[in-house]
Amino acid sequence: MISSFKRAAVLCALVACGANASAQDFPARPITLVVPFAAGGNNDVSGRIIAQKMGELLGQPVVVDNRAGAAGAIGASAVARARNDGYTLGFLSSGPLATNMSLYKTLPYDSTKDFSPVVKTTTSPSVLVVHPSVPVGNLKELVAYLKGNAGKINYGTSGAGSSPHLSAVLFESLAGVAMTHIPYKGGNQVNTDLLSGQIQLSFSPILEVVPHIQAGKLKAIAVTSATRSSLLPDVPAIAETLPGYEVITWNGVVAPAGTPPEVVARLNKAAVDAVNSPEVKTKLLQLGLEPAPSSPDEFLAFIKSEIGSFAKLVKLAGVEAQ
């Protein structure tokens, strides 16, 4: 009996030592970073910027693998099914990790169970912009104007349940106003019709509209983050007038559930150091993204909070899960 106990103890010790050695040696080969969107977009470009710096810090390449489709679900599912050894990661956004949980009846993954969060990397607010023909100069004037013209102002979005749509729905609810929603199949047509005056208002990604704001073709009213954005420091936050307002998009790195904590910690340090590096910060800001690195626990709590927040907004918007 004693001999059996001794053998078991030795075996357990060897397994533990092997796991520790493996974590200490990590990474011993290239890491794959799955981006669940097509190459060339903001998610892809920012993911590549962070991946390159992480690779330098880790001493092994971090190679981006684009797995686009199904609103990010294909790529997210690939990460969830991968071996939990730290060599397959996902660069996921608020869509696949939070919004999708309310927009789809079934998903091939569960955001809170199938991933080990590594780090939140960036956040990005939208900016509420109006066509110059709308006779307002600030948010209070806009709210008053909308109340006097209920349903007469059209706002465009990239589709029902999209971040711009949910941003508008929360604004309508807190401000007590009503606008007419014009959903498009993509953001490009929204900007085209907004600039021509066919629609009068939108909640747009900052990077897309800054040139038009600077040219006087659009008026920036407020940003959707809880506080002012460093990208548009002179533009107030909606929350300054409507307390409690906040709708942002964000990105982060996740690993498959069950990835060893030591490996997650190693990846977190590399990602945080990468995002905080001056050259990466500059590149991210140029993309309209604000660096916001976190710990793994902070990112997990944030994901859970965002799932709840988006669920309320989707219900408020009356969008039915597909």
Regions from the PLM with identified roles:
Residues M1-V10:
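Bacterial N-terminal signal peptides that target proteins for export
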Residues C17-A23:
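Sec/Tat signal peptide C-region and signal peptidase I cleavage site
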Residues A23-K113, K152-N154, G176-L201, P293-S294, ...:
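N-terminal (or domain-start) structured segment
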Residues A28-P30, S173-L174, Q214, A237, ...:
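An extracytoplasmic/periplasmic, membrane-proximal ligand-sensing/linker region
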Residues M54, R81-Y87, S102-Q189, I238, ...:
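Hinge/capping helix and adjacent helix->loop/strand transition within the periplasmic-binding protein
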Residues G90-P96, N100, T157, G187, ...:
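Beta->alpha turn/N-cap motifs
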Residues P96-T106, H165, L170-L174, L201-D234:
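A ligand-binding cleft/hinge motif common to bilobed small-molecule-binding domains
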